Amino acid sequence: MPKLEQFEIKKYWQIFSGLKPIENKVNHDQVLPILYNSKLDSSVLNKIWFLADIDDDDNLDFEEFVICMRLIFDMVNKNISSVPDELPDWLIPGSKVNLIKERKKRKQIENADLPPKKEIKVDWYMSPDDLNQYEKIYNSCAKLTDGTITFNELSTKLSTKFFNISKTDLNKVWSLINPQNLPSIDRDPTFYFIHCLRQRNDLGAEIPASLPNSLAEVCNKKQLSYDLRSSQPPTKRKEEANEVDNLRDNGQNSSSDSSGSNVLSNEDSIKQKYASLTDDQVANMREQLEGLLNYKKSEKTQGGSKLSKRINIRSITDDLDNIEQQVEVLENYLNNKRHELQALQAEIN
């Protein structure tokens, strides 16, 4: 690693001055654009910052800034393959020699007092404060039209918040909470993605090889498909509807009674299916169903398109009726839950 040259120091001074230091120091937020533009892994940047911040005040004076910049450039230009555990003597400013010695002594004492490291496991429970924090991150992310978020969007956002996680950590947790290898994930898996990485960053928790069964069900659930050309097999509801249509075509008026009983049976099954959902899950599902309903309606009105010619109008009508029914059931369920909540709040007060 070549030693510092005078022209380098002048270049670093120009950069340092451009960051508008306060009391001859710059903080992490001021240096963050430089760190981010280096494209180095966040764990590497975190180690560089630790080495450069010799007095541990979370700010860099010019001498410390020079150390930070030199290590970054050496990593980017591949002059070194990894960040050293300790600063080389030629990179330590004369005014900081005593501070370096004190830091080494503190580290030795701390290591001597530390008990053997135990493996920290991820705790999947999320407190209300955790949920509020993850909700803010989720809302700040750019989403696709179906409300899901891509890996690139999430990893870019979290790399600016968690400095102790690597790209490998991001990829491992993404594979963990996205077992179907989907291009994007919805709200619940996103929360677990953030929650796991946060514990990895803050506590050094080990990334598990698999999810608990209850979480695996959440992360394995299929997203609602909006593709009318999908090759999914016909549902039982559609088969029953076709049987009713055949009876009607043959002049058997009793089909209306059969259809009515099917609707009641279908409504009961929908209520049972959604009875265990939370208010947030109900609201999210309602939003998806309404989106699909609007999409189907627009497709039905565009009868002149090539796609609509290939679609059975009767099956579209069945889909519209079924979706409207599910939306109505969900609305009733959500209203009942709200009334229950109001009643509980009234009892507490």
Curated annotation (Swiss-Prot):
Keywords: Actin-binding, Calcium, Cell membrane, Coiled coil, Cytoplasm, Cytoskeleton, Endocytosis, Endosome, Membrane, Metal-binding, Phosphoprotein, Repeat
SMART domains associated with the record: EH
GO cellular component: actin cortical patch; actin cytoskeleton-regulatory complex; cell periphery; cytoplasm; endosome membrane; mating projection tip; plasma membrane
Gene Ontology process terms (BP): actin filament organization; ascospore wall assembly; cell wall organization; endocytosis; endosomal transport; reticulophagy
Gene3D superfamilies: EF-hand
InterPro entries in UniProt: EF-hand-dom_pair, EF_Hand_1_Ca_BS, EF_hand_dom, EH_dom, End3
UniProt keyword annotation of Signal present: no
Outcome (variant: residue 258 to N): In strain: YJM 280, YJM 320, YJM 326, YJM 627, YJM 789 and YJM 1129
Stretches for region 2 X 20 AA approximate repeats: 276-334
Domain EH residues, every copy: 8-98, 130-222
Coiled coil: 307-349
Sites of Phosphoserine modification: 276
Membrane topology: Peripheral membrane protein
Binding site for Ca(2+): 53, 55, 57, 59, 64
SUPFAM superfamilies, per the entry: EF-hand
Quaternary data: Component of the PAN1 actin cytoskeleton-regulatory complex composed of at least END3, PAN1, and SLA1. Interacts with SCD5, SLA2 and YAP1802. Interacts directly with PAN1; the interaction with PAN1 is prevented by PAN1 phosphorylation by PKR1.
Note: Present with 2610 molecules/cell in log phase SD medium.
Role: Component of the PAN1 actin cytoskeleton-regulatory complex required for the internalization of endosomes during actin-coupled endocytosis. The complex links the site of endocytosis to the cell membrane-associated actin cytoskeleton. Mediates uptake of external molecules and vacuolar degradation of plasma membrane proteins. Plays a role in the proper organization of the cell membrane-associated actin cytoskeleton and promotes its destabilization.
Protein name per Swiss-Prot or TrEMBL: Actin cytoskeleton-regulatory complex protein END3
Organism: Saccharomyces cerevisiae (strain ATCC 204508 / S288c)
Lineage: Eukaryota, Fungi, Dikarya, Ascomycota, Saccharomycotina
Name of the gene encoding the protein in the UniProt record: END3
